[in-house]
């Protein structure tokens, strides 16, 4: 009877140890992945701010927009030319001061693609910020629909939770959203 109890105790210790190692491994990989994603977006932000090399391909960019009759888009802003060379589906950049939100905005005909892919078109559980397939940056509008995950780590749109605080809203009333063709500043009207 005593030997059976000793065996059960040892088995329980081994099982608990295996579970603990598995949990530590999972959280280690999870944290590493979040750090890697943050570093990737920091590099993209630096690439955005870097001057484009002269003589880079200046061909017109074809975007996936609601109206495909637009044949000659306006010139691309210099700060987005380097990123556009990485992925022609780049449509803009969204930034909110004092948050982690400082990301490229993608657009494609498939609204689900960028739920789990990044600008480099690699699998990324954080996905990307992306514009609805039916929005057209070439048509004047005061409304664009942007999608992104609300990550618990604060990445992507995770820091939007701060807007539930009235004083935070008053201190941060604007969102900067630039298309690759023009800069834009949008006032936040409602939070829900």
What residues fall within each predicted segment?
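N-terminal Lys/Arg-rich, disordered targeting/topogenic segments
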Residues: 1-8
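Hydrophobic H-region at the start of alpha-helical membrane spans
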Residues: 10-21
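Solvent-exposed, non-transmembrane regions of membrane-associated and secreted proteins
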Residues: 20-192
């Amino acid at each position: 009877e005593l030997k059976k109890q000793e065996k059960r105790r040892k088995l329980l210790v081994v099982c608990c140890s295996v579970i603990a190692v598995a949990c530590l491994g999972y959280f280690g990989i999870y944290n590493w992945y979040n750090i890697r994603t943050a570093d990737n977006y920091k590099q993209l932000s630096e690439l955005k701010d870097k001057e484009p090399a002269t003589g880079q391909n200046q061909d017109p960019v074809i975007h996936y927009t609601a109206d495909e009759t637009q044949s000659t888009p306006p010139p691309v802003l210099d700060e987005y030319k380097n990123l556009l060379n990485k992925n022609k589906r780049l449509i803009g950049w969204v930034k909110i001061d004092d948050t982690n939100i400082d990301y490229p905005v993608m657009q494609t005909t498939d609204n689900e693609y960028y739920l789990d892919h990044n600008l480099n078109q690699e699998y990324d559980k954080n996905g990307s910020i992306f514009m609805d397939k039916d929005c057209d940056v070439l048509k004047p509008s005061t409304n664009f629909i942007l999608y992104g995950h609300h990550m618990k780590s604060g990445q992507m749109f995770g820091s939007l939770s701060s807007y539930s605080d009235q004083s935070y809203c008053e201190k941060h009333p604007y969102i900067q959203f630039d298309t690759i063709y023009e800069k834009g500043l949008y006032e936040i009207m409602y939070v829900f």
